[in-house]
Amino acid sequence: MLQSEDIDGQCINCHHYRNYKTDNMQFHVRQLKGGTIIVNGDEVKKINLKTDSTISAGVYPAWHPTHNFIAYSINDTGQSFHTKNNNKIEVQDLKSDLILYDIDRNEVSFIEHDTLEWEVFPAWAPDGKTLYYNSAHYEIQN
């Protein structure tokens, strides 16, 4: 078991499991020692999904139900803090795309990459044949 105290209290979030089992899972560690931890059977590795051509590292994950793939949205996010309730924080995406991480090959490829579309929240169909996600058209009007 990993606890945030093991990594100096840093944020651990966005846990995701293949088929709700702990044999295959992933989670993100944020800040200085950040990265994505992938558990694939007995193998545990830390990866960085940020490349020169991506907006960010992986954000919102979705394990393929049968293959060693994880779809991620990659997002440029911002936070808004409420003045009336200091504990309430809103997060919004400023940009987003979708990538596919091939665990066996350690390769990242784009699923969607369009500056006028925001793609987020990937989810595989139970049979793994279809990847669903939210998409919103974004264009600044003059």
What kind of feature is each model-predicted range?
Residues 24-28, 69-73, 130-134:
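Residue position within the beta-strands of beta-propeller blades
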Residues 1-35:
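Preference for long, solvent-exposed alpha-helical segments and helix-linker "stalks"
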Residues 33, 93-97:
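A detector of repeated loop/turn-to-beta-strand junctions in beta-rich toroidal repeat architectures
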Residues 72-93, 134-142:
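Short, conserved, GDST-rich strand-edge loop motifs in beta-rich repeat architectures
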